[in-house]
Amino acid sequence: ACTQNSHTMMGRSIVKETTLNEYLKNPKSGNEDFKLESYKGKVSPSELNLYQEWEPSVHFWNMSIDLSKCHGCGACVIACHAENNVPVVGKQEVRKNRDMHWLRVDRYYSSDMTKDLAEEKGIGAIEMYKMMEEPSSEESLEVVFQPVMCQHCNQAPCENVCPVAATTHSNEGLNQMTYNRCIGTRYCMNNCPYKVRRFNWFNYKDNDNFDFNMNDDLGKMVLNPDVTVRARGVMEKCSMCIQNIQKTKLDAKRERRKIRDGEVSCACETACDTGAIVFGDALDSNSRISKEKKHPRTYALLEELNTQPSVFYKTKVRNKNKVNKNV
């Protein structure tokens, strides 16, 4: 049972990387600004915006993920499950593409197949992508790990298609789920370009077929009381650990002070032993996340869609002579 190819975003500029030598010469190497062709010529996606402009109010929660620091240990995934009462569905459900993770770690291997090579040899798109999934030879094999969760887009495609407004946007930049309003159409899951939304096919917490951690008295004692246990037929996804955000806001209000930088943390950030994940308020100009956002290595996933994510990534820097363009 493997989810590696279930939610693939192959064929797009998902992972960006460069070498240390190139990075020292040019901090933006491997992370050139993306431009779209238009009647005005080449422009950035934000210049072709069809949405109404949105401005955050008091806070603007953002997350940064450094691909150079992530080594794919999976601690963030386990922490997310424990903190947010995400059910363990087992191998049989995973084989049916019914996996349940708010956060996944995508693994990309370097490949000898490229788009240019496929075009030269007359190989079709489906066959090309199949060949791209085959790793290159052991001598030149490279791997990249990339954590992917809900990107909390500020122009979210999922929000437009929900017929009951079960997924909405907060004034702090979070994409929110209202579970008791969701009727399970799965339109949002279908319209999400990042494939991060999950559907509850069963009532996992009281189902003997899923004898893992939610259907006995002892298992229910370790559930987080601050997080709703979802029922059958509703969608769920990363909430940026909203319960921790709200608790910190209440603590700061009680003490009549502002929230300090680093005071709010997500479960994945806390569990990451390399410090690859940084979370914070981007409206605080002195915060670490604000500095990460302005870093020349920073880029957004699927920038060409102009979803304006609140999660961004930093280019992977390899300490070698030449970068492999075929990851």
Language-model features and meaning:
Residues 1-327:
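Non-ligating segments of multi-cofactor redox enzymes
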